[in-house]
């Protein structure tokens, strides 16, 4: 039963069917299923298939966008419930301000990462896309963040990750936050070059990295 729901959810993401995704996500909540697994084995597995198909030219952008929107619908239902359960089980592991850098409106990877952080017990403040360095820092100061996570999906916007770190230095705040970077064109070499505290290739890597950095 559980596997079939997860398989159906994965397929609904691939099909970009928002209604079915909403229905199945709500069903997972109502039936008290493992919601972290629902995100990982349903939503994330589906979007991974879509990502691979897109890279190999088997899916076109409009279909990819439909799948991305369907995933947002699922996350909107599941994330608050995961966060609620996390809160009832005790304090959060830390606060993470997350966003896609200025000039970049890609958010699939960021959304998956945010969901995984929430599932792992972190309080996530997702700023969305096209966020300036000042925006990241202002929110981090406001909420008392431990980590700033900056995603860039374009080679032309990667530089904004560097600018974020430079802005923190400029404001004498560099030691106040750990900065994690990620996104398609980024790498460990890039993270080292710009002085980031870490780089994550996948959402799971990001959680592992945050745990390591904060000693959780």
UniProtKB/Swiss-Prot annotation:
Methylcob(III)alamin binds at residue 106. One of its GO terms (molecular function) is methionine synthase activity. One of its GO terms (biological process) is methanogenesis. Keywords: Cobalt, Metal-binding, One-carbon metabolism. Residues 93-216 form the B12-binding domain. Residues 1-90 form the B12-binding N-terminal domain. One of its GO terms (cellular component) is cytosol. It holds the Pfam family B12-binding. Probably harbors a corrinoid prosthetic group and acts as a methyl group carrier between MtgB and MtgA. A methyl group from glycine betaine is likely first transferred to the corrinoid prosthetic group of the enzyme by MtgB, and then transferred to tetrahydrofolate (THF) by MtgA. The methyl group may then be ultimately converted to carbon dioxide, and its oxidation would also provide reducing equivalents for anaerobic respiration. Thus, may function in the pathway that allows anaerobic methylotrophic growth of D.hafniense using glycine betaine. Belongs to the methylamine corrinoid protein family. This is Corrinoid protein DSY3155. The lineage of its organism: Bacteria, Bacillati, Bacillota, Clostridia, Eubacteriales.
